Amino acid sequence: MKAITLLGSTGSIGTQTLDIVAQYPDQFRIVGMAAGRNIELLSQQIRQFRPEIVAIADPNQLSDLKDAIADVDPQPQLLAGEAGVVEVAAYGDAESVVTGIVGCAGLLPTIAAIKAGKDIALANKETLIAGGPVVLPLVEKHGVKLLPADSEHSAIFQCLQGVPEGGLRRIILTASGGAFRDWPVEKLPEVTVADALKHPNWSMGKKITVDSATLMNKGLEVIEAHYLFGVDYDHIDIVIHPQSIIHSLIELQDTSVLAQLGWPDMRLPLLYSLSWPERIATDWEQLDLVKSGDLTFREPNHQKYPCMQLAYDVGRMGGAMPAVMNAANEQAVALFLEEKISFLDIPKVIETACDRYQSQNTLQPSLEDILAADQWARQEILTISQSQTPVVTASPQLSAI
């Protein structure tokens, strides 16, 4: 039985991971949990899964959590704040840590887990996007496994099983196209928050659903694929696949193409990240190709999705630039969800922040450099958004790449 620590237990990734644990109690057990602010759900999870150690990100809610589980016996060790989440991530009994925390907040806990010798089921893509230059050397140093738990990178990882070194030519990431896949570009100025949160295929959290609508999510996945699989940006492509049945593909040196297919269900990549290299039999709905119907593809519209090209440009720059773009995006999406900037302002303010940071980019950043870049970008987005016209004028360097 594998002992698991779950970071972000009350979020979308966390609840689906717990569905798996509940369905396969002879395979997995939860020893540690960390969550944000949802005390009601967290207390229910503690009662059901009986973790040994729990952290809540908001220290002000620790006493309320204690009261909510006062009758639980035995009591888990309770911690709070960022330091508490980091301690849970490194907790001794866990073999694998599922990183379901949204955004760059997952970076420090993931690093702590790696240093403690835990295998990582990576559902927090920002860990690699912002921290790749630091995280990858630590993974190698501590001899842990970094297993992708999101659908696209899990698909690539599965397709690569048995492919000899040097056999991979190209990665093809599939994208649903998000909420505005079928909207004309001319209609995008009318986008509301409610519109952006209507994903056609997947059930996800608000931030990642907006990222899907801007296609920044796919741009971030390009950078993640670069770090995970060591593939140059020139050999990572994106294609719109509206049905979300093919989760990604690889092309081999002989032009053979391998793909991983399945219904849009995050539990499958999560399960594989926990069971690898084994396959666990499930009773989940099997893919019916006749029922799924046509599988279609189209080229992304660069005018509709400017975030996609921005991510390629920033990825090629390397260093701390991906951390800046990632943090700028997180802050911009938060402002959009608060209706403080428009949907079309999201790529504009992000590119403005990236343009302003370029001259101070560090190509071999330390963890401190990455965290400083992250904080700089968040503040810069607030500054840009408070100006009257947060409109970008792309730098020659960004435009030329």
Curated annotation (Swiss-Prot):
Record field: catalytic activity: 2-C-methyl-D-erythritol 4-phosphate + NADP(+) = 1-deoxy-D-xylulose 5-phosphate + NADPH + H(+)
Domain of life of the native organism: Bacteria
Summary of the function given for this chain in its UniProt record: Catalyzes the NADPH-dependent rearrangement and reduction of 1-deoxy-D-xylulose-5-phosphate (DXP) to 2-C-methyl-D-erythritol 4-phosphate (MEP).
Gene expressing this chain: dxr
Taxonomic classification: Bacteria, Bacillati, Cyanobacteriota, Cyanophyceae, Acaryochloridales
GO biological process, one term: isopentenyl diphosphate biosynthetic process, methylerythritol 4-phosphate pathway involved in terpenoid biosynthetic process
Record-level Gene Ontology MF annotations: 1-deoxy-D-xylulose-5-phosphate reductoisomerase activity; manganese ion binding; NADPH binding
E.C. no: 1.1.1.267
InterPro entries in the record: DXP_reductoisomerase (IPR003821), DXP_reductoisomerase_C (IPR013644), DXP_reductoisomerase_N (IPR013512), DXPR_C (IPR026877), DXPR_C_sf (IPR036169), NAD(P)-bd_dom_sf (IPR036291)
Keywords from the UniProt entry: Isoprene biosynthesis, Manganese, Metal-binding, NADP, Oxidoreductase
Cofactor(s), names only, from the UniProt record: Mg(2+); Mn(2+)
Protein name per Swiss-Prot or TrEMBL: 1-deoxy-D-xylulose 5-phosphate reductoisomerase
Recorded family membership: Belongs to the DXR family.
Record-listed 1-deoxy-D-xylulose 5-phosphate binding positions: K125, S151, E152, S176, H199, S212, N217, K218, E221
Species whose genome carries this gene: Acaryochloris marina (strain MBIC 11017)
Enzyme class: oxidoreductase
Sequence positions that bind Mn(2+): D150, E152, E221
Binding site for NADPH: T10, G11, S12, I13, G36, R37, N38, N124, E126, G205
UniProt pathway: Isoprenoid biosynthesis; isopentenyl diphosphate biosynthesis via DXP pathway; isopentenyl diphosphate from 1-deoxy-D-xylulose 5-phosphate: step 1/6
